[in-house]
Amino acid sequence: MKIKIALEWFLNPDHLPMIAGLVTGKYKEAGIEVEIIQPKEHYDGFEDLKAGNIDIHCNEPLHLYEHHFEGIRSLGCFFETRGGVMIRADRVEKLRSNEKIKITTPASNPVTNKIGFEIIKRYADKNGFVIDKENVEFVEKDFWHLKNMKEDESFDGAWLCFYNFEGIEAKLEGFENLFIDQFESPYPNFSALEFMSTQSTIEKKGDAICKFIEVTNEMNKYLKNNPIEAQSIYYDYTKEQKNILMDSIILDTLIRLESEIKVDALRWRELYCFLEELELVKLNEQEYAKIWNTSHH
């Protein structure tokens, strides 16, 4: 049976579990034909999921709430990293002085900007200084955070950074920074990827989806134990030129793969409360409970 899965952005090492399932032929052995679709925009997958054009979408868990629609279901989280706002080391003083700061982000909209500011604000509260909302400007660029900061000195930082990407890249390049994640600022982490589907898809393809999760679970375990093999699987599939940065990103990504992909109603509960507090989402108890009521899986 065919399973169409849409990613949240371009193919990268976060998606290694699925890449491995394809390269090793394990999905095929389990009787499922998996097709990976890369989106044009970060949120494309939700429209496709709702319309039934795809069977599974992977995206950050906050979108289960923020892009909630009747029938959306979680299939479990397969990867979690540290994430947040990266500030150039030499601009931290500027931040502390409540001066105007400019931040590059792949998505500048009221929701992501509000979350980005809240993370900085909580960091400020924790460290005893004040930051005004009007002093933080989010400018929409693309996902190449470090490149954008290097090419444009006016950027003081970047928002929507994953440590296994930007953190590793900055470390390799000697780009000094303050990485404001959930350890620096008290907020619930959501830099993770969750498999999502819909009730109607689960009713139609429940067995195939179960198989998909089963094989992907196996791949996670295999990759974590075989880092060199994981690198060659990645290069084999993407046809990218082997390089030190990608090697390092892959190694850091592997330690962040989940040992077991499972539906967990409590895992992102605190995240839901955080988003509700920011008046970004509002679900009743029944709507919340239904997200995790993936009966067939």
What are these regions (language model features)?
Residues G128-E137, L178-I180, T238-L251, V281-Y288:
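Short, surface-exposed acidic
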Residues K205-L280:
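Secondary-structure end/capping motifs
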Residues F46-E47, Y65, K147-N148, I168, ...:
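Alpha-helical segments flanking ligand/cofactor-binding loops in enzyme cores
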Residues I37-Q38, Y43-G45, Y65-E66, E166, ...:
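Short secondary-structure capping/turn micro-motifs that flank functional sites
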Residues K141-K147, E153-F155:
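Internal, conserved structured core segments that host functional sites
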Residues K2-F138, S154-F162:
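Short, glycine-/small- and polar/acidic-enriched structural segments
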Residues P61, E151-D236:
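Pocket-lining segment of extracytoplasmic ligand-binding domains
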Residues Y272-H297:
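Conserved C-terminal helix/tail region of periplasmic/extracytoplasmic solute-binding proteins
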